[in-house]
Amino acid sequence: MVRMGCPQFAPIRPMANNARIEHTSTEGHEGDATCVAYFGGQLFSGGADGKIRIWSPQLELISTVNAHESYIYCMAVNQHGKIYSSSCDGQVHFMLPPYEDSAVQELFRCHDAIQAMYCDGSVLYTGDDKGVVTTWSNDRMLFKYSLVEEVKSLAGEQKLIYTVRDLDVVVSLVVEGKSGKYSNKAVLPGKSPILLLGPLVEGKRSFLAFPDRSGMGLQLVNNLPQQQFSHIWRLPNCHEWIVNAICGDEKYLYSGGYDKKLKGWTDLDAAQPRSLGEVDVGSCVNSVCCGENNMVYIASSDGFIRAAKFI
């Protein structure tokens, strides 16, 4: 098992000034907008009102689905456009197009809070507040892994499961052929949320990003096997308050949180990333996701959805 220490701090390179809010939804969720996901030219937002709203790329409202009776924690979308959502009542639902009330089905219900979900192709990963990660394929449970600590954010790729709460990112290697067996591959100081991003190399994302333990700094580590999760850079205190949300793609990383800012970063494989600037959202950032044409979508505590561009 690899336990990584802290790298040298990287200073932030000069900021560009192209960041702006392109679109804002004309209506919002009742209460917080809690999560966003993008697929097939449509944006999906979940809220404290239990609804999933579906938007055009320009944030024109297409439809509203009554997905849950209570607060939606998170969403994930698989390669076929199946939308999974979890709520504070312990239920996980899913739906396929056409996205409407009658399409909502129950995957499972439990007494635990499913606070994190992730799709890798057709495989769904769910993580709960008791530290249990469950893998699903074709809506059938494959394995359960008891990782002990509450799962606030997770990702999965090939035989690796990435989980985090508030102190450490844990990378677990699934033992092939043994139900629920795993070994710890690496432990990295940091807290939620976590994100796999960067170019794909033999089916694996090049980078893993997550905040430091303060919650206000960002760090990026190598995710490819030969590099053993070595740090690329670390940016302490690049936000004034705790980071709640990150998203990214092959070239860019975006981060937002309680400071009501969304910030963009590029040149990710350099010794220090280059800042793309920031936008003032005007409300706490709860969730972000990448869309098409370098658009970034923001779910915030005022219930509204915004679209920002940095390029």
Which residues does each PLM region occupy?
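Blade-level signature of beta-propeller repeat domains, shared across WD40, Kelch, NHL, RCC1
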Residues: 285-311
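Conserved beta-strand element within WD40/beta-propeller blades
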Residues: 43-47, 83-87, 124-127, 161-165, ...
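WD40/WD-repeat beta-propeller blade N-cap
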Residues: 25-33, 65-73, 107-115, 145-151, ...
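Beta-strand-rich domains and repeat architectures in extracellular enzymes and scaffolds
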Residues: 25-50
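Hydrophobic core register within WD40 beta-propeller blades
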Residues: 36, 75, 117, 154, ...
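Short loop/turn segments that connect beta-strands within beta-propeller blades
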Residues: 56-60, 96-100, 137-140, 174-178, ...
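A short helix->beta-strand "capping" segment at the edge of beta-propeller domains
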Residues: 6-30
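Short coil/turn segments within WD40 beta-propeller repeats
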Residues: 31-34, 49-53, 70-73, 89-93, ...
